[in-house]
Amino acid sequence: MTTNYIFVTGGVVSSLGKGIAAASLAAILEARGLKVTMMKLDPYINVDPGTMSPTQHGEVFVTEDGAETDLDLGHYERFIRTKMTKRNNFTAGRVYADVLRKERRGDYLGATIQVIPHITNAIKDRVIAGSEGHDIAIVEVGGTVGDIESLPFMEAIRQLAIEVGREHAMFMHLTLVPYLAAAGEVKTKPTQHSVKELLSIGIQPDILVCRSDRMIPANERKKIALFCNVPEKAVISMKDVDSIYKIPQLIRSQGLDDLVCARFGINAPEADLSEWEQVIYEEANPTGEVTIGMVGKYTELPDAYKSVNEALKHAGLKNRLSVTIKYVDSQDVETKGTDVLNGLDAILVPGGFGDRGIEGKIRAAQYARENKIPYLGICLGMQVALIEYARNVAGMEGAHSTEFNKNTKYPVVGLITEWVDGEGNVEERSEKSDLGGTMRLGSQLCHLEKGTKAYELYGSATIHERHRHRYEVNNLLRPQIEKAGLKVSGLSADKKLVEVIENPAHPWFVAAQFHPEFTSTPRDGHPLFAGFVKAAGQFQRGELK
């Protein structure tokens, strides 16, 4: 099978939405019956985003095989059915590390290692390996054209397009077309300069996707086509919309997928976007609204919780409810008290690291438990719920996690030193292990106990969910907590690690060690989030019992 490549680049400014545009195109091509995959090439020197600050980079998305990747891979999985793996995202740091490792081994037989050809060849090899077995691979290059860091990647995709043949490669470039209110018109000059920069490194775009707050007028489209050397029909308007799930229809209406199929000589049926039409209908026609408080420490940047935000929206679609997320800094709960949690229909404590704001999260879990407010804890959100219950119900005064207090009398949460991964291999860690890539990562099997809330929600005794953590419930103290009434409803494959807890004395109090948000999609939702948002609606109406 010959794979066709669409290389996606961006210009003028960052954060234009390359990932959304690429994923939307992928969704349309998939709806035409094509086998599509996506890749993200990140020019930064970090080996992966696993140890990067969420306030700088946004969330770390975890794939089924345990790769810590860019949040754009979350967009990819939410738009298409293909599951991402460690092959679908790599960084300049990863490429350089691999090349240097080979040089130390002597694989290059004494050659002088250079960006061209060694780094560019390594990039091309990874792109080819990650796209095998697919009709179309959409490859997004991070950053903005002109960045020093992205030059090796730009050179690599330029070379690869020549090597596979231009009949099997396309370049799609996203640019900004700003509207100047004073002049009353959109300006095309930034796009012209961006394409000029791209041409200077040997890449002629085949498609221009123009980001603006409005549709690009016909005269301006003609002007862009003329000065940027692309057909007028290849100038695509991508205006601001109130939902990212409207983008597939927006670009389909302008024939972007037809351009791609014509270029690659693909004869495929028309795209069936009925599933996306249903998503848009559900989003536009809610029967009610709920407010969910997200208590975390990275609340100044919503992208730090991108998958959780989207999962809540998906759950809203399944319940025909509009979900408003109120971000609550956990430090505010510490300094201002639980009054900041008043008026919420449900409380969610997501994952996180570090002790800043930890007591605020614990108090939020206590507030939800005592006031019978629906509570969903994810990863650290499960651990704080357990700590709170141990302290205030089980009589274990000062109970804590060894992540935050190594000398606690009741270490109800501690470092995992050994576990079995998703492939059955035994993994071992210690406090001296590196931070990067040393967590329990990826999809793991979980056993759910029949008759529990978790089992009721999933409708199955076995599930697979993705993990990203290095601390777990201390089994030595577990019996004391369970005796006080807390229910362990989910266990790992070897039955040694606690995966799900719930409070039978509460109408809806569930917390999981895994990250269910990574598998939620707009078309299918996720049972845990769907049940949580449903409970929020019932709580608001006074029907939750």
UniProtKB/Swiss-Prot annotation:
CTP binds at residues 14, 147-149, 187-192, 223. It is an enzyme of class 6 (ligase). Disulfide bonds: none annotated. This is CTP synthase. GO terms for biological process: 'de novo' CTP biosynthetic process; CTP biosynthetic process; pyrimidine nucleobase biosynthetic process. Keywords: ATP-binding, Glutamine amidotransferase, Ligase, Magnesium, Metal-binding, Nucleotide-binding, Pyrimidine biosynthesis. Catalyzes the ATP-dependent amination of UTP to CTP with either L-glutamine or ammonia as the source of nitrogen. Regulates intracellular CTP levels through interactions with the four ribonucleotide triphosphates. Pathway: Pyrimidine metabolism; CTP biosynthesis via de novo pathway; CTP from UDP: step 2/2.
